[in-house]
Curated annotation (Swiss-Prot):
GO terms for biological process: translation. GO terms for molecular function: rRNA binding; structural constituent of ribosome. This is Large ribosomal subunit protein uL24c. It comes from Rhodomonas salina. PANTHER family: MITOCHONDRIAL RIBOSOMAL PROTEIN L24.
Length: 102
């Protein structure tokens, strides 16, 4: 998957298009991600026991990973990620849009 937990991403499609948030959870089986404060849904919960009251829960629903792109806050640009090796041979992630500017 092209994104990791903790990445800052920009939403490309849907009702939250253009918003920026951080990935809090990754669901690998379905290639979905949960982004903080994005795609917030409400669920109405009926009371289960006598004397209990109903609730309205808010939660962040997952969105497909193809609908997000990694966001660079320093240059304020969303870009795909390329992998390169540094001097010590360690793999690092580099923004493709920033490769052409250097």
């Amino acid at each position: 998957m092209h994104v990791k937990q903790g990445d800052t991403v920009k939403i490309l499609t849907g009702k939250d298009k253009g918003k920026i948030g951080e990935i809090t959870k990754i669901i690998k089986g379905s290639n979905q991600v949960v982004v903080q404060d994005i795609n917030v849904k409400k669920k109405h919960v009926k009371p289960r026991k006598e004397g209990e009251i109903g609730k309205i829960l808010q939660f962040e629903a997952p969105i497909h990973s193809s609908n997000v792109m990694v966001y660079n806050a320093e240059s304020q640009v969303a870009s795909r990620v390329n992998y390169q090796k540094d001097e010590s041979g360690k793999k690092i992630r580099v923004f493709k849009k920033l490769l052409n500017t250097n």
